[in-house]
């Protein structure tokens, strides 16, 4: 294995920390990018353009990280007092949008100026334990709260609505289909739910396996919903058109599937904490391919990416990982 690391350089510009690192390059084109020690990057999102920035939530330090994958340089932007960011997604405006559990708010960071705008949830919503954001076809931000909530922010007006989840606590991962429908997974509730994006009503959809611990969800190009099962170590697929399910067991001993993401070729990517690996699943051949981390305890909690690249945040190792998606 070849690893090339440059000396760490740091300076401060406009209150944002900038650090320069070269990636560690591993076998099969897998690359690792160190970030600030103790930041414990939780979620990750990739700007869609090739070579564009990679955003990550530095949950332990209350910052948004911005990585330039071409140089290995990363920048950190403080999000506000008490911040504990969880999820991040790149919106239709090209900006990173963050679910911030510490501030009980949705946060936008301007990709050019680094200006931070905080959209606080209504006071009567209480502490929601914000988790994952996604955008609907009208450019509105939807979000989950593990305390038993989901909600919607209209960036144009600043209006925020919050609903109680039909089965209480557990809403975790969230996704939008190509047609603009929104789904979430309930970890504690072991189900998936479809949200009517106009009324806000959520309809529960039960997977065949009980108590599976549906953690995260992602849509493929056909609008099928892929679900990572934390408790049972499976990946499930719900086809809304047929109203049918299929499920597959991840390889290995006692797998625990945390994150799920679907690439532009409709390959399904997962993280298996038991195997300390990213796992690719081909729905056509029904074959799995594993990409173990070169360090123990990677604890990848989220996957996102863009054409040709799957990105994950190794929260246990304070670094990001990129696996070629081909």
Identify what each model region corresponds to.
Residues 68-72, 110-114, 154-158, 196-200, ...:
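Short loop/turn segments that connect beta-strands within beta-propeller blades
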Residues 2-17:
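Bacterial N-terminal signal peptides that target proteins for export
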Residues 30-35, 73-78, 115-122, 159-164, ...:
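A short beta-strand motif characteristic of beta-propeller blades
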Residues 54-60, 96-103, 141-147, 183-188, ...:
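Conserved beta-strand positions in repeat-built beta-propeller and related beta-rich domains
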Residues 297-326:
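Blade-level signature of beta-propeller repeat domains, shared across WD40, Kelch, NHL, RCC1
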Residues 27-56, 67, 323:
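An edge-strand/N-cap motif at the start of beta-rich repeat modules
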Residues 37-51, 81-93, 124-138, 144, ...:
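Beta-rich, blade/repeat-based domains predominating
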Residues 63-65, 104-108, 148-152, 191-194, ...:
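A short loop-to-beta-strand structural motif that recurs across blades of beta-propeller domains
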